[in-house]
Amino acid sequence: MPTLQQLIRFGRQQVMVRPKSAALKRCPQRRGVCVKVYTTTPKKPNSALRKVARVKLTSGYEVTAYIPGIGHNLQEHSVVLVRGGRVKDLPGVRYHIIRGALDTAGVKNRVRSRSKYGVKKA
């Protein structure tokens, strides 16, 4: 516990808050190029093959981003739009690819929650 004199001389040190999506550099989304598209398995209680992509962003970072929805058309060198948002059961995956933007197609036959998966009204 500092004394009053120490507080007058030095003040209190500010607590640094680390950003959850540093690679976006304070932007809502970033464009990037897929370096590798692959599947990975989730943490312990869950079991699946989650589709993810390694993306080189325009900010210079290379991040792992989740591909939401059923089926996708992404491959190496595809240009994608990346937003923040982690996947709870995939360690190290802190970004999502936006469906229906740039080279990423929307989800086929999607009827509900269409705006989240880049599908136009039928």
Swiss-Prot record:
Cellular component annotations (GO), alphabetically ordered: chloroplast; small ribosomal subunit
Keywords: Chloroplast, Plastid, Ribonucleoprotein, Ribosomal protein, RNA-binding, rRNA-binding
Gene3D superfamilies referenced in this protein's UniProt entry, alphabetically: Nucleic acid-binding proteins (2.40.50.140)
Any GO MF annotation of the entry: rRNA binding
SUPFAM superfamilies listed in its UniProt record: Nucleic acid-binding proteins
Classification via InterPro entries: NA-bd_OB-fold, Ribosomal_uS12, Ribosomal_uS12_bac
Subcellular location(s) of the protein: Plastid, Chloroplast
Signal peptide range in chain numbering: none
GO biological process, one term: translation
Quaternary structure and partners: Part of the 30S ribosomal subunit.
Family statement drawn from the similarity comment of this UniProt entry: Belongs to the universal ribosomal protein uS12 family.
Free-text function comment from the UniProt entry: With S4 and S5 plays an important role in translational accuracy. Located at the interface of the 30S and 50S subunits.
Cross-referenced NCBIfam families: rpsL_bact
Protein name: Small ribosomal subunit protein uS12c
Organism annotation: Cyanidioschyzon merolae (strain NIES-3377 / 10D)
Organism classification: Eukaryota, Rhodophyta, Bangiophyceae, Cyanidiales, Cyanidiaceae
Gene symbol of the encoding locus: rps12
